[in-house]
Amino acid sequence: MTTIKLYKHFFILFSLTILLGCGKPDTSQLIDKALEAEHRTPSYVQRDKYRHPKETLLFFGLDPEQSIIEITPGYGWYTEILAPLIRNKGQYSYTSLRLHEKINPFFVKLESAFKEKMEKNPDIYDQLRWVHFNPKQPEFAPN
């Protein structure tokens, strides 16, 4: 090989290496940003040291372009982290345990509080999608 061809191959490999480094932001950094966001409930932030959300999400291979379904999100501890993480390129869906024949008052209260919280922050939660979930027929992720 001539020196010019070697330089050409080196330049191509070097350019590809640089381009690979210019990809999407590191998921770890995006999780850090979500964990430090101002919209998070202060008492939930305090829980992070016990629940280890960053480590958990990295362990499960979270990707900001994924579709996520959170079953019964409670008052939204994980939602505060997940929703902004996947807001632009992924899809966040949540379910509640509303049953056809009987609705437990606790779950009605929980769902109402969750929805109210989401409505107060449309800049973060406007892309959320509610999916009906019946534990007796657990099909909630059509295609």
Where are these regions (language model features)?
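Bacterial signal peptide processing site
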Residues: 23-25
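Bacterial N-terminal signal peptides that target proteins for export
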Residues: 2-11
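Class I SAM-dependent methyltransferase Rossmann-like catalytic core
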Residues: 30-59, 63
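Conserved SAM-binding loop of SAM-dependent methyltransferases across substrates and taxa
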Residues: 75-88
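Conserved SAM-binding strand-loop segment of SAM-dependent methyltransferases
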Residues: 123-136
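A short acidic, Gly/Pro-enriched loop at the edge of an enzyme's catalytic core
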Residues: 138-143
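C-terminal motif of bacterial Sec signal peptides marking the signal peptidase cleavage site
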Residues: 19-21
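Conserved class I S-adenosyl-L-methionine
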Residues: 65-74
